[in-house]
């Protein structure tokens, strides 16, 4: 409020565009994080590639979407613009539909059930039964979402542990699909 009464137009515009000054503590934490960013991103991408291989060949997976996969519509662009990998977000479908997807999410223990992305820990969510459960089937389909879709944000854990966690999820999904 004070800025709008006494500040210059340029000062107001800068404050609007860039926000207030960082506190020294926040600046310190950002600098600390930047020191290890390349290492963390490399681990994210290594884990993502390993999980893409795992998911694309898994018998309980109906489909996998990620720009690093050759059948993705944006593959050529992603390969050109992001030669080290197109990020650690994967979407895949669990065979068995909505209930199988929900069972998968409820069975995993290492992976956190959160809607966030880009964390150090692996995050999974079943949009059809959580964030998009209030949307009708036609609107979900129009938005590119399906009942079997799991959104995965790959974390930094040991990839063997993530795979073992997912196997527990797939086992639960098979049981749910059989019911």
Annotate the PLM regions:
Residues 29-39, 88-95, 151-155:
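Short, well-ordered beta-strand elements within core beta-sheets of diverse protein domains
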Residues 19-53:
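A conserved active-site cap/scaffold subdomain adjacent to cofactor or substrate pockets
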Residues 106, 122-179:
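PLP-dependent enzyme catalytic core of the Aspartate aminotransferase-like
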Residues 22-26, 82-85, 142-147:
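Short, flexible turn/loop "capping" segments at secondary-structure junctions
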Residues 49-116, 121, 135-141:
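Conserved small-domain helix->loop->beta segment predominantly found in fold-type I
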Residues 13-17:
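TM-loop-TM module centered on a large, flexible mid-protein loop between adjacent transmembrane helices
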Residues 1-7, 11:
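Single conserved hydrophobic/aromatic residue that forms the stacking wall/gate
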């Amino acid at each position: 409020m004070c800025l709008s009464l006494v500040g210059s137009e340029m000062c107001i515009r800068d404050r609007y565009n860039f926000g207030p000054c960082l506190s020294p503590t926040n600046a310190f934490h950002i600098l600390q994080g930047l020191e290890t960013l390349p290492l963390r991103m490399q681990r994210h991408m290594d884990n993502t590639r390993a999980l893409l291989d795992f998911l694309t060949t898994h018998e309980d997976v109906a489909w996998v979407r990620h720009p690093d996969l050759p059948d993705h519509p944006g593959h050529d662009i992603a390969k050109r613009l992001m030669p080290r990998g197109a990020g650690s977000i994967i979407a895949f479908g669990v065979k068995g539909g909505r209930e199988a997807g929900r069972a998968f999410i409820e069975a995993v223990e290492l992976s956190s059930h959160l809607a966030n992305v880009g964390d150090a820990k692996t995050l999974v969510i079943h949009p059809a039964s959580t964030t998009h459960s209030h949307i009708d089937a036609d609107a979900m389909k129009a938005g590119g979402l399906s009942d079997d879709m799991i959104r995965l944000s790959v974390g930094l854990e040991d990839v063997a542990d993530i795979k073992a966690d997912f196997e527990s999820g797939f086992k639960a999904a098979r049981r749910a699909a059989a019911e």
